[in-house]
Amino acid sequence: MSADTAAPAALTADAAVVGAGPAGLAAALELARAGLDVLLLDEQAEPGGQYYRRPGPEVLDAVGDHRPEGGRLVARVRAAGVRVLSGHTVWGVDDDRRTLLAASPGGAAVRVRARWVVAATGAYERSVPFPGWQLPGVVTPGLAQHMSAEGVRLGRRAVVAGSGPFLLPVACALLERGVRVVAVAEAGRPYTPGPASLGALRFPARLAELASYAARLARHGVRVHQDTVVARAHGADRVEAVTLTRFSDPERVVARHGVDLLCVGYGFRPQADLPRLLGCAVDRDPATGDTVPRLTPTGRSSVPHVYVVGEAAGAAGAPTALARGRAAALDILASSGRAPDRGERRRLAVHLASLAGFTRLTAALYPAPAELVPALARRLPGPTLVCRCECVTADAVRAAAAAEGGSDVPAVKGGTRAGMGLCQARECGPALEALRAGGPGTGTVPARVPLRPLPLAAVLELADTPGEDV
């Protein structure tokens, strides 16, 4: 076991940062540079998160590092003296709502107690079921982009579908790996000129990036359909074709394409389970329907020693995640008597405000998930699998929700086992919330321990610790 992954059974630090993506790395670096003892925990084998995920040496030699700045940031974090615990899964919180419970790469129990906790747990892709989504060859855009960066060609003919600005770069990444992208299907109309699109002129760099993606797709003859969603994936042993229909008119077929790869995703959801276990107050975002922590502009939660940063505070992209991580660290330093430069804090606040403006523009251009997801869920045919882990259909979820006492999400889960598989409702959660009898968006999937699947030995080890009740 490397120095990065070796850990005793109990650890203490000034600050524990959970998640080694852009936000967690930025926060850990700022805190360590100021002299704090910082622990950085991440479940992946190497720090960097999904955004800065670095391929192995053999892939680097073959295709290069598409985000070398991530490797440089990780090197600075290590040089600053941050104790990096790779391969450590934070799966719960002790009864004191302060001590973190984790499992080491070998499955050993690890308890972490720190004066400050920074939750930089990231986000996961928002999936919405459709007939055939369980077929091999149907993947999320994030997985497709990650595998493309690793030099892997997932298929020969693909459709990229869903909603959000992420679809275009994913389609371009597939093209770079030799995949024939036959179409991009966007549920909204973000590329139609209108008052909202004029706001993009205030962000010329982002506009140029979007234009470069669009130009690349045009050169390859990729058709971009707007107001279009996946109605059904067809195939026996794997996906063979996809039917696209109008989002505004489900009976109107736009196209049917033969494919062996279908990438579908509707943006990202903040991974806020850990803050919820720590007792942080949360709200429902009316635009996305997501449960988000209630935070100050610097990421401080309702629990004074807990900060939530990056995508866990609301999906907004890597530049915002980096800035949020630094802002939280500077606020912690101010609270702990290590006064940071006030000018730097002001400049960072201005930068965050500018980034927030772009996030608002994106939200205005694309359909609100709080409306999009329920609309798609309502039109699901009864036999469609909603929970792929436990093989639960839309009919079964609707029946459980209509039963007496079954109108909240936990009751639906208890009556059907939907959301009780390995993904713990990360895939089917939005559909469960939309299909419940109480109406779309009025119930949420609760945060439960363990947050992640873990070896039974880790739980038994804690249970054998004097004074511990697990």
Language model features with spans:
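Residues forming the flavin
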Residues: 2-416, 420-422, 426-470
